[in-house]
């Protein structure tokens, strides 16, 4: 009975449910399409399906009007969905720009190759978020994984036979495009400027970007948002994007195809160094800008020596350089009289050239530090001040090597300084002004160190012979000449002041030789204490030596300040972050080092102590060679041939093997070349090649000798990676020429600079061509 009642009422319930369900679905569809969400091709949503009873399966019967309305709403929803998708992607007209919109966070990962249009990121391309984490990662990221193939080999052989004008930028930058992988750094370096500019302008045709003449990595939709009025910027999804102004501020970073904390490489092949400045400079600025308070607890907790240390000693330091021209000529005349028995001091004074320096006015010291400023004995030459050059009365030998850094003037200065040191003016506690006792009363008063170079603000280094202090002095911005001598920042000149004291067991004669050698050679190489009116005797990679001053207890050498520290600090900072210098960065430093050493060799001086601690840097990456205390003058102005020397000199890891052979003479120029090779390997490897180059005392060096004797190659050199196989091949060949145990087979610095490796190395310092 109960079942019959259910059966009789079931048809009525089904019709009502069907009608309600149809109305519910129609309303749901209307609401769905009005809001623009959902997909027009997918039918009812999950929420609409859940609203209907699951037990009822009677099909819906919509009216004709409902179907027409649904079709119209479907078309509207489809168009709306396409519009939304277009606005989300930020796609402009396909015929104008196929590039897809990329968020700011992924902007630096863009590839400059054809893969950029597909949104794929080449894993071989280095971007700013991928530091050189380790040796293995540096192989994968910095240099790219390259797999050899027959196609690449054949293409290399074909390209090698083609004329160089096909790749004008190739010969200028890297020199070898043969086996370069698409998407790597070397691919970008190989592109000609016309190719890079054309491809960049296709990506961005913005009028503003054309005026800036820059290479855009941004999609067209961002570079010119007003191009397509149908897709305004405000309708785009902004979850992962930023404003155009903020994006333009990151333009320089996005243009770099490689970027680290200290080095960047750009698509046109040039690079930029941005080395950090030592903290003491920033601390000084903060202390000067910070308001002074009457009391501070910080003084109780200082554990290092600060601004006040040794201030009294520096305040009493006086210069050993002559105060004016007259006194200097008078002293040199006395020295000549004593050595040559010439009593015509006044006559000699009239015949001496511009040999002095005005310490107070920073007069030009070029002639004193230049060997080629001395004419021959049978000639007499007047300068602009009316003084004449030396003649036969001086009994000076004829100069045969005008380029030598040690000439007549330098020899006289060495004798003068040596005499003062041997007489014990400073080291025996006599007054500082005793040095000036021979000067006439009309000579101007000498300036103390603090008056001339400012006050000390702290210690920046410490060596075996004393400490190095930093001094600063405010100057007038209208004095441009002084800015060339040393580091200049915020109307302040900074000077490095090196303290020189004899060791407890060091004989005075040895100390005077070391002191005069370091100062006079450095002064002569850097052009002396002058206002840079003539740059004929200056070199960008030689540290400027400015002055030598004295106190009752020590000597102080005033030098140019390099605010970015030395190469040793740069390498250790990279090692702490498990990275090494980029090969292009190391190549640039190597080329600068070789140019500086070449300049020294051309003037008769070998450094003999090349190591990372003696290579300083400016923030722009300019390398400066310093510390000439162990330098060897192998050829003076009166010698036609170079002289060899015996005995080891320098630091053991950088010393050439022939120096350790007892009583064997060696060419100091070839020793410098060996040391330069060690320096380069330390930069790219992050560690020494070996501790000492003596057979039987170092297992690594023994392995090197064994590999070279049996196989003619060393695995360390072969495993080094570069940005291209061509550059890697050129570099490896040069390293084998450097590390020849037999010095007679070793390459010279001049020949190394002419090698394919160095000729294709991009350097941030421009050097004038050497005269033939």
Swiss-Prot record:
A GO term for molecular function: ATP binding
Organism of origin: Kluyveromyces lactis (strain ATCC 8585 / CBS 2359 / DSM 70799 / NBRC 1267 / NRRL Y-1140 / WM37) (Yeast)
Any one annotated GO CC term: cytosol
Superkingdom to which the source organism belongs: Eukaryota
One Pfam family per UniProt: Pkinase
Composition-biased stretches (Low complexity): 20-33, 41-59, 146-158
SMART domains reported in the protein's UniProt record: S_TKc (SM00220)
Compositional bias of kind Basic and acidic residues: 9-19, 66-86
Domain Protein kinase span(s) in chain numbering: 454-758
Annotated spans, Disordered: 1-102, 115-165, 185-241, 344-396
InterPro entries assigned to the protein according to its UniProt record, in alphabetical order: Kinase-like_dom_sf, Prot_kinase_dom, Ser/Thr_kinase_AS
Name of the protein described by the UniProt record: Probable serine/threonine-protein kinase HAL5-like
Enzyme Commission number, as recorded: 2.7.11.1
Record's compositionally biased regions (Basic residues): 202-212
Glycosyltransferase recorded as keyword: no
Catalytic activity: L-seryl-[protein] + ATP = O-phospho-L-seryl-[protein] + ADP + H(+); L-threonyl-[protein] + ATP = O-phospho-L-threonyl-[protein] + ADP + H(+)
GO BP of this protein: intracellular monoatomic cation homeostasis
The UniProt record lists the keyword Ligase: no
SUPFAM superfamilies: Protein kinase-like (PK-like)
Enzyme class: transferase
Active site: residue positions: 609 (proton acceptor)
Keywords associated with the record: ATP-binding, Kinase, Nucleotide-binding, Serine/threonine-protein kinase, Transferase
Record-linked Gene3D superfamilies: Transferase(Phosphotransferase) domain 1
Similarity comment: Belongs to the protein kinase superfamily. CAMK Ser/Thr protein kinase family. NPR/HAL subfamily. HAL5 sub-subfamily.
Xref: PANTHER family: SERINE/THREONINE KINASE, SERINE_THREONINE-PROTEIN KINASE HAL5-RELATED
Residues engaged in binding ATP: 460-468, 498
């Amino acid at each position: 009975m109960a079942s019959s009642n259910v059966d009789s009422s079931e048809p009525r319930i089904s019709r009502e449910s069907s009608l309600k369900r149809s109305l519910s679905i129609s309303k749901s569809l209307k609401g769905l399409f009005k809001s623009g969400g959902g997909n027009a091709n997918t039918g009812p949503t999950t929420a609409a399906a859940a609203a209907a009873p699951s037990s009822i399966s009677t099909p819906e019967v919509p009216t004709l009007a409902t179907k027409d309305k649904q079709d119209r709403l479907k078309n509207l929803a489809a168009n709306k969905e396409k519009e939304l998708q277009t606005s989300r992607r930020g796609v402009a007209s396909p015929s104008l720009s196929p590039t897809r919109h990329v968020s700011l966070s992924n902007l630096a990962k863009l590839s400059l190759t054809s893969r950029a249009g597909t949104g794929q990121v080449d894993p071989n391309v280095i971007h700013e978020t991928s530091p050189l984490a380790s040796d293995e990662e540096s192989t994968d990221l910095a240099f790219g994984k390259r797999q050899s193939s027959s196609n690449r080999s054949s293409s290399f052989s074909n390209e090698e036979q083609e004329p160089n004008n096909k790749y004008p930028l190739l010969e200028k930058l890297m020199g070898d495009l043969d086996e370069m992988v698409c998407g790597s750094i070397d691919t970008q370096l190989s592109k000609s400027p016309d190719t890079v500019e054309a491809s960049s302008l296709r990506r961005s045709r913005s009028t503003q970007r054309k005026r800036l003449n820059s290479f855009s990595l941004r999609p067209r939709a961002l570079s010119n948002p007003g191009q397509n009025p149908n897709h305004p910027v405000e309708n785009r999804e902004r979850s992962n994007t930023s404003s155009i102004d903020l994006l333009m501020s990151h333009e320089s970073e996005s243009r770099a195809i490689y970027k680290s904390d200290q080095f960047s490489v750009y698509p046109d092949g040039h690079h930029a160094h941005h080395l950090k400045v030592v903290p003491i400079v920033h601390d000084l600025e903060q202390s000067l800008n910070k308001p002074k308070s009457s009391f501070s607890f910080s003084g109780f907790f200082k554990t290092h020596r600060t601004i006040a240390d040794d201030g009294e000693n520096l305040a009493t330091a006086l210069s050993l350089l002559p105060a004016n021209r007259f006194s200097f000529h008078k002293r040199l005349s006395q020295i000549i009289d004593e050595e040559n028995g010439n009593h015509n001091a006044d006559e000699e004074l009239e015949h001496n050239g511009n040999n002095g320096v005005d310490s107070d006015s920073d007069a030009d010291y070029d002639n004193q530090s230049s060997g080629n400023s001395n004419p021959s004995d049978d000639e007499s030459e007047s300068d602009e001040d009316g003084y004449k050059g030396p003649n036969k009365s001086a009994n000076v030998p004829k100069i045969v090597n005008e380029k030598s850094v040690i000439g007549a003037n330098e020899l006289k200065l060495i004798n003068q300084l040596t005499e003062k040191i041997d007489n014990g003016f400073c080291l025996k506690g006599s007054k500082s002004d005793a040095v000036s006792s021979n000067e006439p009363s009309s000579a101007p008063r000498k300036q103390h160190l603090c008056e001339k170079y400012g006050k000390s603000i702290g210690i920046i280094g410490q060596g075996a012979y004393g400490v190095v202090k930093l001094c600063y002095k405010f100057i007038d911005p209208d004095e441009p000449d002084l800015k060339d001598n040393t580091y200049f920042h915020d109307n302040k000149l900074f000077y490095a002041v090196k303290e020189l004291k004899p060791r407890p067991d060091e004989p005075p004669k040895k100390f005077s030789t070391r002191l005069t050698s370091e100062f006079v050679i450095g002064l002569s190489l850097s052009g002396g204490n002058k206002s840079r009116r003539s740059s004929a005797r200056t070199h960008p990679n030689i540290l400027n030596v400015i002055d030598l001053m004295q106190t009752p207890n020590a000597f102080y050498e005033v030098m140019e300040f390099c605010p970015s520290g030395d190469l040793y600090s740069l390498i250790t900072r990279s090692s702490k972050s498990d990275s090494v210098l980029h090969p292009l960065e190391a190549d640039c430093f190597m080329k600068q080092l070789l140019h500086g050493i070449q300049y020294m060799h051309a003037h008769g001086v070998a450094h003999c102590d090349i190591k990372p601690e003696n290579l300083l840097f400016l923030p722009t990456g300019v390398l400066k060679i310093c510390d000439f205390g162990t330098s060897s003058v192998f050829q003076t102005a009166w010698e036609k041939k170079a002289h060899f020397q015996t005995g080891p000199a320098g630091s053991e890891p950088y010393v050439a093997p022939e120096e350790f052979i007892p009583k064997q003479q060696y060419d100091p120029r070839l020793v410098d070349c060996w040391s330069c090779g060690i320096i380069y390997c330390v930069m790219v490897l992050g560690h020494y090649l070996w501790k000492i180059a003596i057979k039987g005392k170092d297992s690594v060096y023994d392995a090197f000798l064994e590999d070279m004797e049996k196989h003619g190659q060393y695995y360390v050199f072969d495993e080094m990676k570069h940005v291209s196989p061509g550059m890697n091949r050129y570099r490896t060949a040069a390293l084998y020429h450097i590390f020849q145990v037999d010095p007679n087979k070793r390459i010279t610095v001049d020949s190394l600079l002419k090698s394919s490796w160095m000729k294709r190395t991009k350097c941030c310092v421009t050097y004038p061509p050497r005269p033939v």
